[in-house]
Swiss-Prot record:
Residues 219-267 form a coiled coil. This is rRNA biogenesis protein RRP36. It is found in: Nucleus, Nucleolus. One of its GO terms (cellular component) is 90S preribosome. Belongs to the RRP36 family.
Length: 345
């Protein structure tokens, strides 16, 4: 307040002739200085606080100061010191009860934000921390992953248990496609027709092939008949466009049927090679020459089939087969040649 600022001023009192007690200047001045210095800091803080809060009352205070100043000049220094001490005690009591709470609220409002903002800041800090940790983890050197290889080519494939499952799901099952099932060649029907014999039921396909082996004879007869038709059309004197189309169709039919017959014969030869090999292995095990049987691979079976076919061929057939083989190899080599050298030879 302005009054307190005026009271804090150090004024030397004039000597008066009244009946007041005479004080020594040194004792009074020392006491006043001690009390003034002790209360100076608190009074200045309170005055600054009130000056910032009560800006509107300053104008009125100035008018009061102008009225009070002439009356203060007549007051003795001892009375001023006593008044200052009394005012200081009263102000301490009032500030302890009234001024502390607004100060605390202001300080807390400045230092600590509102709960909503503080929670948002904490959430942002946690989120930033987690992102920083993820960044560090991604930049960190990953340990070299061990390649999982199979112990052998016959072993099952190895897959990690952490392998991600496919996100694709079959919501609607596709419609079942009708598959032809001929009861004459069905394994279930053939197993019942073998009267429950497990050895014959396991080889149902073999028995079906043996039961319907006459179809292959029909196929050979049909191929011979088609070849006769082609030769008759080719020797025809007046051929039409329809005859030409018929010759092309018959030749295509003969090629497909002959390929089917050769595939059937090749499978039969492979089956015979496997049967003979198993028979030999069983005999060797029975004689004690071997402890475990040896199973042929597909490439070995194929080589034995080719060797068997060459032994069964006649001289002309062998020459024809060797010529086809030579042309096939020469064509592959020609494709690998540069384009400029292909016509030289």
């Amino acid at each position: 307040m302005p009054i307190s600022s005026t009271l804090n001023q150090r004024v030397r009192a004039r000597l008066e002739n009244d009946g007041f007690e005479h004080f020594s200047d040194e004792s009074v001045s020392n006491e006043a200085l001690d009390e003034g210095e002790s209360n100076e800091d608190t009074e200045q803080d309170n005055s600054d606080q009130r000056e910032t809060d009560d800006d509107d009352t300053e104008d009125d205070g100035h008018t009061e100061i102008s009225d009070i100043n002439p009356s203060l000049n007549t007051i003795s220094f001892g009375a001023l010191a006593k008044a200052q001490a009394a005012l200081g005690k009263r102000k301490r009591r009032t500030t302890s009860t009234t001024d502390i709470t607004p100060k605390r609220t202001k300080v807390l409002s400045r230092q600590s934000p509102t709960p909503s903002t503080s929670s948002n800041k904490e959430h942002d800090q946690c989120q930033g921390l987690s992102e920083f940790q993820k960044h560090l983890a991604s930049n960190a050197k990953k340990p070299p992953q061990k390649l999982t290889h199979r112990t052998s080519k016959h072993a099952p494939t190895i897959q990690s248990s952490r392998h991600a499952v496919s996100r694709k799901r079959t919501i609607l099952e596709p419609l079942a496609v009708p598959k032809p099932r001929d009861p004459r060649f069905d394994s279930v029907v053939l197993s019942h027709s073998t009267n429950g014999d497990p050895s014959t039921a396991a080889n149902a396909d073999i028995h079906a092939r043996n039961n319907y082996a006459f179809l292959n004879h029909y196929r050979t007869d049909e191929i011979a008949e088609l070849r006769k038709q082609v030769s008759a059309l080719q020797t025809k004197k007046k051929k039409t466009e329809r005859d030409d189309h018929e010759i092309v169709r018959l030749k295509r039919e003969i090629t497909s049927m002959s390929d089917r017959q050769r595939a059937f014969e090749r499978k039969e030869m492979e089956r015979e090679v496997l049967v003979q090999h198993r028979r030999r292995e069983k005999e060797l095990i029975r004689e004690g020459k071997k402890s475990q049987p040896y199973f042929l691979k597909k490439g070995e079976v194929k080589r034995e089939v080719i060797a068997k076919r060459f032994t069964e061929m006649s001289g002309k057939e062998k020459q024809r087969a060797l010529e086809r083989r030579r042309k096939k190899v020469a064509g592959k080599e020609r494709k690998e040649m540069p384009w400029g050298r292909r016509g030289v030879e």
